[in-house]
Amino acid sequence: MLRVVGEPRHIDRAIKRLQGALKGVPARGVRLTWRGGELRTAIHWTRDDSFWWAFEPRRARDGIAARHALLLGYAPDPPTKRESITCEINLPRAGTDRKVAGIVVADANGALYLAHSGRMGGARSGQRKAGFREFLADGVWRKVTWPDGEESEALIVAPLDSPRLTRLLGQFVDSVRRFKAGEPASPRSGLCVAPMQVESTVTACDRRLVDAALHEELAKRGLFGGAHDLFSLRGVRPQPLFALVADGRADELALAVGSLSLASARNGPDIRPILIAPASLADGDAALDALPFACVRFRWRGARAVFDGLDDALEG
């Protein structure tokens, strides 16, 4: 289980890692507004991930300890001189504080993660602060242990050592934007095999990026048939059924192959099983090449997953 860390050196390490990973085009003298306040500061726009960010120190007040505030705003276009804050992640400078939503957690190996309690302020009228948990049900939610032994659930935003940290943070900002705008949660697809529940936290975060990239590629091909099932084709048979192997562990691969084989036996020509596997695992693997269904390789191009052979697999 992940544990909440409050040691100043760990928090400083987390802040330095965030500041080192977050780049972007600077925009100075920007007026940032939120419900009940505003400030003027410099922000940085990460164009490829559609958000801007800024760090601001916050003094102790109203029983809340001094903290680092990571201000975030959704920005598919270059920021203007006035921007609205989509959300902020507050991290105590030392110790732990359940009154703020930002959390730094560590795994058994000492790797650090940026996490969020899931309580989301500033939402629309009628939205519960706990409603974000329901909205982002497919997020990477994990049990965490506090120094006093209490346990709670937190959303893992990103592993702080991940080369894809910025992309994961952008994904979080977009999720918050959609939630606060009152958009419906993305429905779960009935045409994707459910992932293993025991996969590592790092793998689970990467899996969401691969899922999102696959979704975009299928959308480009006009393959979506409606709001109820994101992966349904417009009455076309066979329907694709995807199983994703995110990191290539033997048990994960066995589950994916077994699930596709069973689904194929049950549904016959009505489905087209497609295995999605890392190129590092799939390239030159005779066993995967011998499978009775297509294997699409994915590889990382920067922070984006790209797929080799997807069109051939869809066409059969």
Please identify what each model-predicted range represents.
Residues 1-61, 180-226:
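Acidic-basic catalytic patches of nuclease active cores, encompassing PD-(D/E)XK
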Residues 77-82, 232-242, 267:
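Active-site beta-strand-loop-beta-strand hairpin of nuclease catalytic cores
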Residues 133-221:
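The feature marks a conserved, polyanion-engaging helical scaffold used by nucleic-acid processing enzymes
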Residues 36-75, 126-159:
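Generic detector of solvent-exposed, compositionally biased contiguous segments
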Residues 80-94:
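Short, hydrophobic/proline-enriched secondary-structure or compact coil segments at domain edges
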Residues 238-240, 248-267:
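Mg2+/Mn2+-dependent nuclease catalytic core
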Residues 294-313:
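Charged, structured surface patches that assemble and position nucleic-acid processing machinery
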Residues 94-98, 104-150, 246, 253, ...:
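Nucleic-acid nuclease catalytic cores
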